[in-house]
A protein has these predicted regions:
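N-terminal, polar/charged subdomain of small-to-medium soluble alpha/beta proteins
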Residues: 1-98
Length: 98
């Protein structure tokens, strides 16, 4: 799986990039058909508390999955996105198995 990480309005640290890659790679446990993952990290409103936004778009063979979440930290936002994508992938698998 090819993973692209884009940071908007700030420079992402190597530690953050490594964290994101590690989390996104875990999605391969749920589907072997994931071709590409695009992650966008962005600071929404610097003056507010919940201002870190993460959006993850997966290109899965013949379909796409997307999750976008806002939280206090990028790590928390990415975790929420990954959990949402896991549910989407599992629902798709269940429909496919019927």
């Amino acid at each position: 799986m090819e993973i692209t990480i884009q940071s908007v309005n700030f420079d992402a640290t190597e530690q953050l990039k490594t964290f994101v890659e590690k989390k996104v790679k875990k999605l391969e446990r749920f589907s072997d058909d994931i071709i590409q993952a695009e992650v966008i990290l962005k600071v929404v409103k610097p003056e507010t508390a919940n201002n870190k936004e993460a959006a993850v778009k997966l290109n899965i063979r013949h379909k796409e999955a997307f999750a976008g979440k806002i939280a206090n930290t990028f790590e928390e936002a990415v975790d929420l996105c990954i959990m949402a994508l896991e549910k989407q992938i599992q629902k798709t698998k269940e429909k496919k198995d019927r």
